[in-house]
Amino acid sequence: MEYIAVAEVLNTHGIKGCLKMRPLTDNIERFDEDICYYLGDKKVKVTIQNYRMYKGFLYIDFEEFNDINEVLGFKKQYLYIDEKDRYELKDGSFYIDDLIGLKAYFNGEYIGDLVDVISIYSNDVYVIKNDEKEFMIPAVKEFIKKIDLENGLIDVVIIEGM
């Protein structure tokens, strides 16, 4: 089974085992779904009892925990789902973990690997890095010409100053 992270545990919240998390999904409604979730490095199977969003953070209560001491060890770990429970994406949309590691090319010349995706309000920014330089490229059609997951490639446009 392959696990996909859907939230990062930042801290505990209160004394009853609630966890404060940073969502790693645009689809917050996914936490309403009756699917299996796995918590932490040991992938402990958990059931979401309740969740809420507040100021961009996700707060989740699990049926399995009702005391802060039971969840302290999960800080800086992740909440996962099984890959089979991923949403189908529209054409032209990609999961970030599928993009990481793509080989980036500009005018047919290798310029580096896609190492990170920064999500900001207007659009994502792809971070492409080689041994000497780092490029930050807006994830818009003017700069991203082609993404080929099958062959592990991304064709980009670089302008002066990137």
Curated annotation (Swiss-Prot):
Domain PRC barrel: 91-162
Organism of origin: Finegoldia magna (strain ATCC 29328 / DSM 20472 / WAL 2508) (Peptostreptococcus magnus)
GO molecular function: ribosome binding
InterPro entries: PRC_barrel-like_sf, PRC_RimM, RimM, RimM_N, RimM_N_sf, Transl_B-barrel_sf
Keyword rRNA processing appears in the UniProt entry: yes
This protein's name: Ribosome maturation factor RimM
Role played: An accessory protein needed during the final step in the assembly of 30S ribosomal subunit, possibly for assembly of the head region. Essential for efficient processing of 16S rRNA. May be needed both before and after RbfA during the maturation of 16S rRNA. It has affinity for free ribosomal 30S subunits but not for 70S ribosomes.
Domain of life the protein comes from: Bacteria
GO CC annotation, single: ribosome
Subunit structure: Binds ribosomal protein uS19.
Keywords: Chaperone, Cytoplasm, Ribosome biogenesis, rRNA processing
Localisation per UniProt entry: Cytoplasm
Note on domains (UniProt): The PRC barrel domain binds ribosomal protein uS19.
Predominant location: cytoplasm
GO terms of biological process kind: ribosomal small subunit biogenesis; rRNA processing
